[in-house]
From Swiss-Prot:
Keywords: Heme, Iron, Metal-binding, Oxygen transport, Transport. The lineage of its organism: Eukaryota, Metazoa, Chordata, Craniata, Vertebrata. GO terms for molecular function: haptoglobin binding; heme binding; metal ion binding; organic acid binding; oxygen binding; oxygen carrier activity; peroxidase activity. The gene is hbb. Involved in oxygen transport from gills to the various peripheral tissues. Hb1 is a heterotetramer of two alpha chains and two beta chains. Belongs to the globin family. It comes from the Eukaryota. Residues 3-147 form the Globin domain. The keyword Nucleus does not apply. GO terms for cellular component: blood microparticle; haptoglobin-hemoglobin complex; hemoglobin complex. It comes from Trematomus bernacchii. This fish has three hemoglobins: Hb1 (major) and two minor hemoglobins (about 1-2% of the total). Hb1 has a strong alkaline Bohr effect, and at low pH exhibits the reduced ligand affinity and cooperativity that comprise the Root effect. This is Hemoglobin subunit beta. Heme b binds at residues 64, 93. InterPro entries: Globin (IPR000971), Globin-like_sf (IPR009050), Globin/Proto (IPR012292), Hemoglobin_b (IPR002337), Hemoglobin_oxygen_transport (IPR050056).
Length: 147
C-alpha cells in the first residue's frame, strides 16, 4: 500500500482540479505516439498516423488522450486503493489489447512533460515529485495483470 502525505494528496487534487483535459490529453498522447512510434501499433483503428502532423490533427487521438486523463480522475478519487481501481483496465490492456506495460510509463512521462510545460514555474520540484509518484502508482496498477 502506498503512503500519501496530506501535502501530496493536496497537490494531486489541485493539479486535477485545474487540469485542462482538452489541451493536455491530446498533446500528451500525440507526443507519445510521435516520440515512441512503436506505440502506434495499438491505435491502428485511429486512421492516419503517418506523420507528426497527422497524429496531432487526428480527432481520435485527441479524444483518447482526453479519455486517458479522465481515467486518471478515478485514481485521484481512490488514492488509497489505486490497484483495485484499475484492475479491470489492467486486465483489458493485458489480455485483450496486449499493450506492452512499458507503454504506460512512456505515456505517463509524456503527460508529465506536457503538464510541466503548461504549468510553467508552478510545476515545482515538490509538485513534480507528487505527480510522478501518483502516475507511478497508476502505472504499477495498470501493469498488475502482467505479473
Amino acid at each position: 500500500m502506498v503512503e500519501w502525505t496530506d501535502k501530496e494528496r493536496s497537490i494531486i487534487s489541485d493539479i486535477f482540479s485545474h487540469m485542462d483535459y482538452d489541451d493536455i490529453g491530446p498533446k500528451a498522447l500525440s507526443r507519445c505516439l510521435i516520440v515512441y512510434p512503436w506505440t502506434q501499433r495499438h491505435f491502428s483503428g485511429f486512421g492516419n498516423l503517418y506523420n507528426a502532423e497527422a497524429i496531432i490533427g487526428n480527432a481520435n487521438v485527441a479524444a483518447h488522450g482526453i479519455k486517458v486523463l479522465h481515467g486518471l480522475d478515478r485514481g485521484v478519487k481512490n488514492m488509497d486503493n489505486i490497484a483495485a481501481t484499475y484492475a479491470d483496465l489492467s486486465t483489458l490492456h493485458s489480455e485483450k489489447l496486449h499493450v506492452d506495460p512499458d507503454n504506460f510509463k512512456l505515456l505517463s512521462d509524456c503527460i508529465t512533460i506536457v503538464l510541466a510545460a503548461k504549468m510553467g514555474h508552478a510545476f515545482t520540484a515538490e509538485t513534480q515529485g507528487a505527480f510522478q509518484k501518483f502516475l507511478a502508482v497508476v502505472v504499477s496498477a495498470l501493469g498488475k495483470q502482467y505479473h
